[in-house]
Amino acid sequence: IIIAIYYSAEHVWRGRERKIHEIADATPLPNWAYVIPKTAAVSLVLIATMLISVVSAIMVQLGKGYTDLELGKYLLWYVVPNVFPAIMIAVLAVFAQALSPNKYVGWGVIVLYIVFQIVASNVGLEHSLYVYGQAPQVPLSDLNNAGSFWKGAWWFRLYWAAFAVLLLVAAHLLWRRGTETRLKPRLQRAPARLKGTPGLIAAVASVVMVGTGIWIFYNTNVLNEYRTRDENERFMAEYEKKYLKYENLPQPSIADVKLVVDLFPAERRAEVTGRYLLRNLTDKPIRDVHVRETDRETKLLDIAFPGARLASHVEDDGYRIYRLDQPMAPGDERMLTFKTQRWNRGFRNSGDDTRLVENGTFLNNMELAPAIGMDPSGLLQDRVRRREYGLAPELRPAKLEDMSATKKSYVGAGWSTPDITLSTEADQTPIGPGKKVSDVTQKGRRTARFVSDAPILTFFSIQSA
């Protein structure tokens, strides 16, 4: 940014500082013949700086004896994605200088842009639709490459590219010719300069920007849930106030779990049917059973709990309380069945789900199925923010002297023998906990069943790649 600030001012104001601007401005060259080359020059300086960093990184690799340089990844994963922000900065820098009466005011405009980027998140403007040139980060891996994550980033880039074109048109309209540097007279002449090709370009860019903006909003805010940082913190604070009081409430343990997981990697979708055998391992009767959705990405579509009625359910919280018709005595067992779905539709503004991907899915049971009972993990941790929301300064672990805490671990108190049937695309390998007892490929699907031959803690994962 510093390079763009300096060189844009030098390019735009050099003629005036050397007193040759009246000669150049008297030529029949159109304004765009000044704007475009200067923008391209600043862009090339920034891109050259980036390429120098690539050469430096390669030299470090070679100096350490590493010869598998993978130049294609330098190009596709570093150079190409960063060319766009370089051009965006160059356009903004040249526009700021075209707008300003002198280069120092232009520098001030760019500084204001930098300050805005820093404080935008603090005033609720975190969405990439509001921050110039910003696009979501693209998660990269050797196994999945960029997957489908690149699509959202390029939609944002198209949106901001259209806006950058509007800035270039504005720079063309406001470009100084002759001795006049005041903004007001240039604004008065702008409508006349907008006629013809500049107006057509501005109209097309406006249509593209509005169209892509609507599409981006539909994906990030309709197909997917979008929350600002403050909204997310407020949600966690309210969630804690409602449900943390149930943390030490006696709950049944999962004694046996059976899952049928159908993965559709190309769609980044998982359909799960499950069954829990719940057992009361406490020494007290249990009247209420708390069922909690532990992952925002996974939706609990259906649940059946014979012998119980739904006493409380807040859908946005994903928290259900069931009142048993007959309390569970110590040692009693009950059956609970459910259906869940995890489906990554469209693209997001940030925080992409990298657990369920085209190649390299890795999901644990808490990301596929509901949990029993309340757990403090995932709540607001920052002490300052907790005080602002009227919460205790921090969530402390149980004291060493608290022997009741030994009755439950991070993943619950009981042990279970998972029975997992996992299906995926025919060209991928499914992996689950336990011993593989069957593996069949038919109709383009590969289905494997895994059964644990010994009890394990109810915390396991499945993979497909």
Positions of PLM-derived features:
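A surface-exposed beta-strand-loop module
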Residues: 295-359, 406-410
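Transmembrane helix boundary and interhelical loop/hinge segments in multi-pass membrane proteins
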Residues: 5-30, 180
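Terminal transmembrane helical anchor/hairpin motif
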Residues: 66, 103-188, 223-225
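N-terminal, polar/Ser/Thr-rich
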Residues: 198-268, 380-392, 408-412
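Long, hydrophobic alpha-helical segments
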Residues: 1-14, 49, 53, 338
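Secretory targeting signals
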Residues: 1, 36-101, 139-142, 149-152
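Asparagine-centered strand-capping/turn motif at beta-strand->loop junctions
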Residues: 263, 277-282
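Extended, low-hydrophobicity, Ser/Thr/Pro/Gly-biased non-transmembrane segments
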Residues: 232-238, 248, 339-464
